[in-house]
Amino acid sequence: MIDVIIAGGGPTGLMLAGELRLHGVRTVVLEKEPTPNQHSRSRGLHARSIEVMDQRGLLERFLAHGEQFRVGGFFAGLAAEWPADLDTAHSYVLAIPQVVTERLLTEHATELGAEIRRGCEVAGLDQDADGVTAELADGTRLRARYLVGCDGGRSTVRRLLGVDFPGEPTRVETLLADVRIDVPVETLTAVVAEVRKTQLRFGAVPAGDGFFRLIVPAQGLSADRAAPTLDELKRCLHATAGTDFGVHSPRWLSRFGDATRLAERYRTGRVLLAGDAAHIHPPTGGQGLNLGIQDAFNLGWKLAAAIGGWAPPDLLDSYHDERHPVAAEVLDNTRAQMTLLSLDPGPRAVRRLMAELVEFPDVNRHLIEKITAIAVRYDLGDGHDLVGRRLRDIPLTEGRLYERMRGGRGLLLDRTGRLSVSGWSDRVDHLADPGAALDVPAALLRPDGHVAWVGEDQDDLLAHLPRWFGAAT
């Protein structure tokens, strides 16, 4: 029997497949599209996702296909410098098209043995105490121990579960288009600069091969959220910029709204939700793909532990407990950003005030930490300030921390050399390293790099190990 069915082969599902296969979990990804995605809605990775790629040994692949930027302005386009003191070894944004991210994650998952079936869509599901039966659109049935819905904002899995998806409806729509233009680039650049003095939901950037990615406010709401036509794009360009730049030969046309919705629960028995199936929000700040990757990084090791038989009773539930509040905060900050992009007098007055505030380094850093997810700290109870945070990559006597965590296991980083994980050594590595660049005597790290315990007392460590790594063997 399959261990895990993943419905959806986008970045979240592919990341999760790699995480599960790292632990030997038999994984099948079902993707309804018959061929790989050729268009990139998202175009970058933030620091936390870059850390994830480093921790899994994938970063060099991504760096080879992306470009590093240290530029501010990610919060509602407010002009700001990139902070110099972010708590990460990867203090930059990696510009990389989503289509490349998906290709690299596909390569990683399949190298580890994940099976990806295209042209397959979940149409029904039934679960019992032992597993989940998924019915595909062609009538085929598959049985697995767990199923994870990574099938996007219009998730079939979420609908079949009957999970509520409360939130705010779309009030404004924006068109995205990769097109060619019939005017000089200098003309396009000049018009964009002039229009953006008042309309910040308008923009144009090179998209490769002579194409430009245009971002244009829609004129009203669509009835069915269907992709716009070239004629609609031209009308919206005329309404916003007074010209359509002679756009032609579109290779991609899409639209997005400013709706924000959050699934009421991420787990229903043996079925879980991740990525856009669990939360949707506007793309302001470029957080959506990154949020899904981090969902997968949180869930993967926990699901593997449940399948491996060593998961503590509440470990799978901690996925919802930890990731649901993170998504709620992202929904809040994207709502705030959309408000700051409004043309109405009230929001524009607030924007002018915010433009003054981001000149303060602490305010600027706070906003960037939100966008990049560096500020995320899971509520793991009382204790040292490090508990619940992801530990940045640090130098060790030999090598780096993230290099030591590429196997997806827990790690006791012990500067004292006096501690032991005997009884958990099949799940937790012990590195006694007095030269580690760590400001505490010892730290217990979960497989996702978050600090579960800090201290130097063996009895206290033994009291905390079972919470995340189950009973001793």
From Swiss-Prot:
Residue ranges the record marks as coiled coil: none
Family: Belongs to the rifampicin monooxygenase family.
Record has Flavoprotein as a keyword: yes
Gene name for this UniProt entry: rox
The name this protein goes by in its record: Rifampicin monooxygenase
Entry-linked Gene3D superfamilies: 3.30.70.2450, 3.40.30.120, FAD/NAD(P)-binding domain
Disruption phenotype: No visible effect on rifampicin resistance.
Organism: Nocardia farcinica (strain IFM 10152)
Binding site for FAD: 12, 31-32, 41, 98, 122, 156, 276, 289-290
Superkingdom, natural source: Bacteria
Keywords noted in UniProt: FAD, Flavoprotein, Monooxygenase, Nucleotide-binding, Oxidoreductase
Residues that, per the record, bind rifampicin: 43, 196, 285
Binding partners and assembly: Homodimer.
